[in-house]
Amino acid sequence: MTLAKPGSGAEFRLNNKANLKSRLVRDLSHAAGQEPEGSESLDPAMVAAVETLLRGIGEDPQREGLKKTPERVVAALKFLTSGYRQSLEDLINGAIFDEGHDEMVLLRDITLFSLCEHHLLPFIGKAHVAYIPRQKVVGLSKIARIVEMYSRRLQVQERLTRQIAEALMTMLDPYGVGVVIEATHMCMVMRGVQKPGSWTVTSSMVGVFQEDPRTREEFLSLIRHPSNL
């Protein structure tokens, strides 16, 4: 089999959780800190809606610290939902190769962040994606980009997991696909039950990953195995 680790390869230990949160903060800061490219690139109705929200919570959108906040929020949302403006075909761009390979290919520990569609709060975590090719393989970076494309939409974790698996099945027609996502949801940390440290695990097993217990167990064992790198 082929095992690829785009990041540290470590499992979810405390330091890894801190790294995930740091990554999210950097990405959100980058998005929110972007100055609008021009008023024509932002939807005035969205900008006005943010101003209305600010007034609704008792703030003054015209005070010094908030003058550009509506534009920044809209720019951030455009970045965080950029997956709506991407397609699977354009993303893959022909990077499928006939290698005659028929053993498991696994890309694990793919960092992801997304927005919960119920509260528009982030959830962050990692995806582990495996498939058994029917001779054809896809460039490894494309798997990470598929995760990113579907993550950058309003999501629930269950659907995100399924969409990643379905995309690989559609694109490669492999013998099977396995996807596991482990994530922490800010809607459970910052509000509601307020339970920091809780993690949600979802899976989507298709083809031999669903039908063959040995294939499924091999996949699950590999994503649990700590990296020695």
Curated annotation (Swiss-Prot):
Gene Ontology biological process: one-carbon metabolic process; tetrahydrobiopterin biosynthetic process; tetrahydrofolate biosynthetic process
Ligand binding (Zn(2+)): 116, 119, 187
EC number: 3.5.4.16
CDD domains: GTP_cyclohydro1 (cd00642)
A GO cellular-component term linked to this record: cytoplasm
Catalytic activity: GTP + H2O = 7,8-dihydroneopterin 3'-triphosphate + formate + H(+)
PROSITE patterns assigned: GTP_CYCLOHYDROL_1_1 (PS00859), GTP_CYCLOHYDROL_1_2 (PS00860)
Cross-referenced PANTHER family: GTP CYCLOHYDROLASE 1, GTP CYCLOHYDROLASE I
Protein name (Swiss-Prot/TrEMBL): GTP cyclohydrolase 1
Native species: Synechococcus sp. (strain JA-3-3Ab) (Cyanobacteria bacterium Yellowstone A-Prime)
